[in-house]
C-alpha cells in the first residue's frame, strides 16, 4: 500500500481506537482511583510491549534514549493521569472534544519551540479553536452544575503534552522504528507506574469484584488503546506531518460521542456548536 493511502488507513484505525478510550476510562473509574487507573494503563501497556518488542530497544543509541524518555513523559505519563482525573468530574464526550485542541497546540508549539513557520489561516484557526473550547466549557459548566468544568483545564494541559510529544518525535526521532520508540517509552515508565500503584493502596482492594471488572477495562485500554495505538501513531507521524497525525483528534469526538450516547451522556445544542467551532478551527490550522 502506498504511503498516501496507508496514512489515511492508520488515521481511521486510530480514531476508532482512541475514540473508544474515553468510555473505557469512565468505566475504569467506577472501581479505581485516577492514580490507580493511570498506573495500570501504563503497566498493562508495558507488559504487552516488552513481550513483543523487547529486542527493538537494542537499536536505540544513548542520545536517542534521552528523547525516548522525554516522549514517554509528555506523550504517556502525564496525560494518563490527567485524563483519568479529568473524567472524575466531566463526561467522556466533552473530554474527547477538548482533546481535539491537540492539532492547534501542535501548531503553536511547532512555531514557538521548533521554528516551524505558520500561515494566516493557521493563526485564524487557532483563534477559532480556542473560542470553541471556551464555548464548550462555559456552556457545559452552566448546564451541568454537578460537573466541575475547571477539570477541563487538565484535558487542555494533556493536549499540550501530546503536542510536545509529536513535535519531539518528528524532529528528533524521525527514523527510529515506531516499535522501538513505544517499547522504550513504556520501559522508561514501568517502575514509576509500579511505585505509584503500590503507594495508592491498590493491593489492598484488588480482590474486590468491582476493582477486577475495572481492571478488565483498563487492560483493554492499556494494550489496545495505548500500546498498539502508540505504535500506529508513531508510524503515522513518520509517514505524514505532526499536524496531520494529530488530526486524528478531529474524528475521536465522533466515536466518543456515540459511546457516550450508549452510556446515557448528552450534549446541549450549544455544546454541539462549540464542538463544531473547534473542528472548524482545527481544519483551518491544518490546511496548507
Annotate each predicted stretch with a short phrase:
Residues 1-36, 85, 144-171, 195, ...:
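Glycine-/small-residue-enriched transmembrane alpha-helix faces in small-molecule transporters
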Residues 31-78, 105-106, 161-165, 182-203, ...:
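Transmembrane alpha-helices of multi-pass small-molecule transport proteins
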